[in-house]
């Protein structure tokens, strides 16, 4: 297979399409039911033929897997379930041979409770240098029986766990993920060495998990709703960390993308200053409902908040933490909110898929970079996981009220007629999460043979985006359009029209149709919930 044409600019990341791989669910090379690096290596040609520019891997490091690998025990070792460090290096090399860059995940807010540092801290006792790398504190109350403060966990419950000697340690997520103390020089030094470790092995970039949570109020004061500053979100000191990281990345020509959930546009933009992160995820677009006015406002706001720091926007519809797009868009309320996930809400998958196809063309036409989550190119819906098969700690921490995120993490279907749809080969074990019985229709081989499939749409759209200089980084100009319709031009006369109205609309005159997300009406009009790319 010929290597894809490289992206057009030196700053490739400004307009790249980056594919997210959740290794545990991507492809199983040894047939044990869990995805691994052998499976990734075998399926890299799929990503090259899809037309993406880079591949982001969620954590593949040694981990007890309490939180899907986001509880890292050793950044310099690959978890045995996935393979070896040698295999990871081969993934990086073989991806490069196919024209694909590799981005790895770093989780700097916390480590696993099985990390050598935390085990040392538990053994060392109160007041020890080993405990200073974390947030150990005596409790409140007459006998220290109460947590040191009232901070709520990201996964429900308290952020504090007591150890046998009476002290408590902080964990914004699960008790198995103790938070690091970023005012400690060992913590900063270790992460800088980890960055160099992976940059030396050829990775092109790093995605930073929970990027706004690292630094904490040194006095660990109680949380008050609306307090400014927040005691552990977006403290000013965090920017010193990212300035030091940027200097390291610049030595290698590598890039950063931050997971930054912030409602304040000005505070968000600070992370994207020229000496900090290159890009950050745009979650407002992901959470936006399928409504024309809301989408246009979100697009405008996103471009405006990036403009002062000259950073490219990123566009994402789905990831390993949120309800899949085809399901969300098939509901009456099409927005996404972690506090209101609408579990069990019926979804019209035919409608949701039609909208997801249109959303794909909208997203790929916007200026900046795009992230695709594995299975988006197949139109996978959210899966219902039986209660006895749920593995996400979010479910257990919520007392069972939150089904968790497993429904968007179900293993990929590759071959319609194979056991487990080819996830683990012909003799593979049962996958770690159950696949729905009707997923043969979503399999890669079946969609590859169908010119009208979601996969065919993505391959065509990505090929056009790569070949057309007007797409990617650049400008966007809105066009006059009927109510319920989004229409804008990019450079070189490229036009995108998305019909979110209740009826068909006329396409602009004197334009050539390049691609549509669905068939046009017999009269040549654009149906509802359909998008088109045209050239003047």
What are these regions (language model features)?
Residues 2-510, 520-536:
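Active-site and adjacent substrate-binding regions of carbohydrate-active enzymes
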């Amino acid at each position: 297979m010929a290597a894809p044409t490289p992206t057009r600019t030196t700053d490739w990341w400004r307009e790249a399409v980056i594919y997210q791989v959740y290794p545990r669910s991507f492809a199983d090379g040894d047939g044990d039911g869990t995805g691994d690096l052998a499976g990734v290596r075998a399926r890299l040609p799929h990503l090259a033929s899809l037309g993406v520019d880079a591949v982001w891997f969620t954590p593949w490091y040694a981990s007890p897997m309490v939180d899907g690998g986001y509880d890292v025990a050793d950044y310099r070792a690959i978890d045995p379930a996935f393979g070896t460090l040698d295999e990871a290096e081969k993934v990086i090399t073989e991806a490069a041979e196919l024209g694909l860059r590799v981005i790895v995940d770093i989780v700097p807010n916390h480590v696993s409770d099985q990390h050598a540092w935390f085990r040392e801290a538990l053994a060392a006792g109160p007041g020890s240098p080993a405990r200073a790398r974390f947030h150990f504190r005596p409790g409140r109350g007459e006998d220290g029986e109460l947590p040191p403060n009232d901070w709520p966990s990201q996964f429900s419950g308290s952020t504090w766990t007591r150890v046998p000697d009476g002290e408590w340690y902080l964990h914004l997520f699960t008790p198995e993920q103790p938070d690091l103390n970023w005012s400690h020089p060992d913590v900063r030094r270790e992460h800088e060495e980890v960055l160099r470790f992976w940059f030396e092995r050829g990775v092109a970039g790093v995605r930073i998990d929970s990027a706004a949570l690292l630094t904490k109020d040194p006095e660990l004061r109680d949380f008050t709703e609306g307090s400014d500053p927040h005691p552990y979100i977006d403290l000013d000191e965090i920017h010193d960390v990212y300035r030091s990281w940027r200097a390291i990345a610049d030595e290698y020509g590598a890039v950063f993308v931050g997971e930054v959930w912030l409602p304040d546009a000005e505070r968000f933009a600070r992370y994207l200053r020229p000496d900090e992160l290159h890009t950050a995820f745009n979650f407002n677009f992901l959470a936006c409902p399928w409504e024309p006015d809301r989408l246009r406002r979100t697009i405008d706001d996103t471009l405006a908040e990036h403009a002062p720091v000259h950073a490219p926007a990123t566009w994402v519809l789905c990831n390993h933490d949120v309800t899949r797009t085809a399901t969300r868009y098939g509901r009456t309320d099409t927005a996404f909110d972690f506090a209101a996930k609408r579990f069990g809400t019926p979804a019209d998958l035919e409608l949701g898929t039609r909208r997801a196809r249109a959303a794909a063309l909208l997203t790929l036409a916007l200026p900046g970079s795009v992230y695709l989550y594995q299975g988006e190119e197949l139109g996978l819906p959210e899966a219902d996981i039986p209660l006895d098969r749920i593995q996400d700690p979010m479910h257990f921490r919520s007392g069972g009220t939150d089904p968790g995120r497993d429904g968007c993490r179900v293993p990929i279907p590759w071959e319609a007629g194979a056991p487990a749809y080819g996830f683990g080969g012909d003799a593979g074990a049962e996958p770690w999460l159950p696949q729905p019985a009707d997923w043969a229709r979503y399999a890669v081989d079946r969609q590859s043979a169908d010119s009208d499939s979601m996969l065919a749409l993505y391959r065509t759209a990505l090929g056009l985006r790569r070949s057309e200089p007007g797409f990617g980084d650049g400008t966007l100009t809105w066009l006059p359009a009927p109510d319920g319709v989004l229409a804008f031009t990019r450079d070189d006369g490229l036009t995108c029209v998305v019909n979110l109205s209740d009826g068909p609309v006329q396409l602009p005159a004197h334009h050539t149709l390049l691609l549509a997300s669905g068939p046009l009406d017999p009269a040549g009009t654009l149906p509802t919930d359909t998008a088109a790319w045209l050239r003047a």
